Amino acid sequence: MFSRLAARLPKASALNGVAARQVRNLSQPAITGSKGRNMPAREPRTTAAATGAEATFTIRDGPVFQGTAFGANTNISGEAVFTTSLVGYPESMTDPSYRGQILVFTQPLIGNYGVPSNERDEFNLLKYFESPHIQCAGIVVSDVATQYSHWTAVQSLGEWCASEGIPAISGVDTRAIVTYLREQGSSLARISIGDEYDADEDEGFIDPGQINLVKRVSTKAPFVVTNPNAKFHVALIDCGVKENILRSLVSRGASVTVFPYNYPIHKVAENFDGVFISNGPGDPTHCQETVYNLAKLMETSPIPIMGICLGHQLLALAVGAKTIKLKYGNRAHNIPALDLTTGQCHITSQNHGYAVDISTLPSDFKEYFVNLNDGSNEGMMHKTRPIFSTQFHPEAKGGPMDSSYLFDKYMENVELFKSNSQVYRDNRPTQFMIDILSKERVGVEPTPLSNAA
């Protein structure tokens, strides 16, 4: 495995080719922190607690598990996936990338440190959650802690699930569930409280893979997350952005304008110093508007671009590559990813069910990171332009911060781009010099700029 990967290690090369353009400030109302998120309204959810009731976890065309309910007294269906993360369940459950999925925790005991408050930081971003609400459809655990202890905790996991309308089941064999999902792949499943549905009733299973989930988690209108000492202005395409991605940008000196996933970003790129594409849920091929807009952006602007997770996949589609669905995905806080430019290995946080088919990547891009567990692609970079993306999450939350330096790399690209733009603006030739140089070069009267194509 390592010998094969070593052969793929290219020499590191600096990003260059940054062209110049004039930077202007976009006229947008500055909304305090992520309170500006205008997420689509959800259907009313049942909030009655179902603690202690009988519950059933049914995998379509697979085994049925009997357990005990906690959380909301409601039935749901979705795609069953598992995470091997030991901690960080509040962050995982509020990660929009889990939208439409039933999350199975392999860690035997969940909930022992409770659920924290919705406190916000100095940028008015949520400190302990990655979005304002639970995003997964339901959770499955081996054992749930009914008593909790932590200085930030304000309620139990069961109380939180009930208040958010999320059903949950405990007392089931999560090892058997994960073994099935690893062998058969991620499967449709449902959680039922009380009497179980007919196991053969297809109407009881909803496939979130057939739905544009990004549309359900993306903001409906642009908003701005401000930094009072901002030196840069970044446009972020919201496909289901995590709070810590916003924090990672704002804390590095940027004000961030967040746009809906299908916003024609290429039409406003000249107002920004960089473009960022966020994480998000579901099949990237559902976001054709985003793919088109990104392709137009790269055709018309040399602006620095960075993508994470779904943003990485959308960027790959925009340059002509293809994506594939993984058998059971990668969802953990301890997955090794090899940097092919340096040979260094990073332990990364991951949450995805799709990956970029590296064999379809165009010649002007190269593979950046590779997964040391399964050999799947974990990143790509342009050979000459300041464009790169990662499949894993350098912002973590939860997970290790090994790769957080990638945000520094992106901001260096942004700073260089802005400074080059300033040099261009300060040194543009005057109309007089354009006329003189044109006459000397071709010996004819130059075409007036106002009439030039």
UniProtKB/Swiss-Prot annotation:
Transit peptide limits: 1-33
Which reaction is catalysed here? hydrogencarbonate + L-glutamine + 2 ATP + H2O = carbamoyl phosphate + L-glutamate + 2 ADP + phosphate + 2 H(+)
Primary site of residence = mitochondrion
The keyword ATP-binding appears for this protein:
yes
User: Annotated pathway, please?
Assistant: Amino-acid biosynthesis; L-arginine biosynthesis; carbamoyl phosphate from bicarbonate: step 1/1
Stretches assigned to the Glutamine amidotransferase type-1 domain: 233-420
How does pH influence this protein's activity? Optimum pH is 7.8-8.0.
Induction record: Repressed by arginine.
User: Which spans of this chain does the record mark as coiled coil?
Assistant: none
Detail which positions bind L-glutamine. 97, 280, 282, 310, 313, 351, 353-354
Location relative to the cell: Mitochondrion matrix
Keyword Magnesium, does the record have it?
Answer: no
Instruction: Please give one Gene Ontology molecular function term for this protein.
Output: glutaminase activity
Query: Which Pfam families does the protein's record reference?
Result: CPSase_sm_chain (PF00988), GATase (PF00117)
Q: What does this protein do?
A: Small subunit of the arginine-specific carbamoyl phosphate synthase (CPSase). CPSase catalyzes the formation of carbamoyl phosphate from the ammonia moiety of glutamine, carbonate, and phosphate donated by ATP, the first step of the arginine biosynthetic pathway. The small subunit (glutamine amidotransferase) binds and cleaves glutamine to supply the large subunit with the substrate ammonia.
Give the multimer and partner information.
Answer: Heterodimer composed of 2 chains; the small (or glutamine) chain promotes the hydrolysis of glutamine to ammonia, which is used by the large (or ammonia) chain to synthesize carbamoyl phosphate.
Q: What is this protein called?
A: Carbamoyl phosphate synthase arginine-specific small chain
Upper taxonomic lineage: Eukaryota, Fungi, Dikarya, Ascomycota, Pezizomycotina
